[in-house]
């Protein structure tokens, strides 16, 4: 069983670039189509670790979907980000949806 370090709705930072993002989905291992060596220069160990679908903002404040290895992410310690309120809102919305009971007819 593979354990993930981050959860859906959690705010994270790109370790190298410092961008703030929100985890929207998790894959236990790399699960996009098999990349060519030029497209993804990572080893098999990295591909076997969890990968995250993360929404981040580009320099213009527009949302960007990224697919990142666990090793590329770090925990975000702050809960509020006045410079990027949309990331805070997205994280809160996802967490509320995960906690809200689902009514079945």
UniProtKB/Swiss-Prot annotation:
<dbReference type="InterPro" id="IPR011722">
    <property type="entry name" value="Hemimethylated_DNA-bd_dom"/>
</dbReference>
<dbReference type="GO" id="GO:0005737">
    <property type="term" value="C:cytoplasm"/>
</dbReference>
<feature type="region of interest" description="Disordered">
    <location>
        <begin position="75"/>
        <end position="105"/>
    </location>
</feature>
<dbReference type="GO" id="GO:0070207">
    <property type="term" value="P:protein homotrimerization"/>
</dbReference>
<keyword id="KW-0963">Cytoplasm</keyword>
<dbReference type="GO" id="GO:0044729">
    <property type="term" value="F:hemi-methylated DNA-binding"/>
</dbReference>
<keyword id="KW-0346">Stress response</keyword>
<protein>
    <recommendedName>
        <fullName>Heat shock protein HspQ</fullName>
    </recommendedName>
</protein>
<dbReference type="InterPro" id="IPR036623">
    <property type="entry name" value="Hemimethylated_DNA-bd_sf"/>
</dbReference>
<dbReference type="Pfam" id="PF08755">
    <property type="entry name" value="YccV-like"/>
</dbReference>
<dbReference type="InterPro" id="IPR022866">
    <property type="entry name" value="HspQ"/>
</dbReference>
<dbReference type="GO" id="GO:0009408">
    <property type="term" value="P:response to heat"/>
</dbReference>
<comment type="similarity">
    <text>Belongs to the HspQ family.</text>
</comment>
<comment type="function">
    <text>Involved in the degradation of certain denaturated proteins, including DnaA, during heat shock stress.</text>
</comment>
<dbReference type="GO" id="GO:0042802">
    <property type="term" value="F:identical protein binding"/>
</dbReference>
